[in-house]
Amino acid sequence: MLIDKDSKLLRANGKEIAVKDVKENMFLIQNELANNVHVKLNDFTYTGYLYTITTANREYKLFSGTHVLTSQGYLSIEKIYSLNTKLDLMLLVTRNTDYGIMSTYFASNRIFAVEREVVEDYECYKVSNVQLVVDSLICVDNS
């Protein structure tokens, strides 16, 4: 899934999908691009959109607006942005703890090249050299 910033189209699996312009050199990847999924974690079922981020060494399942269990805890991807570089992503991330939802670094910040930035009052992290792809998984049951 690649962003063509000139035509503002997102190409995935041979399909071209328009991308909403958020601000200069930044395009919001809309939720409709990913599959609507129901995710069951710890007796709670969330409805959201499933993404997979792949690198040369790792693969991460991410759920927009819901939570995914990782070795770092439960993470919520609030929004996914693409910068003007085709394979750079900016992730807005929170961690679900016993004390509620709190901002945190992306769990893979020791794996990717991550730079902290602030966009629209959110803590954001630029994750380099990754590719965002839509996954076809229907349901994850972690119980």
Regions found by a protein language model. Give the residues of each.
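Autoprocessing domains of the Hint superfamily
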Residues: M1-S143
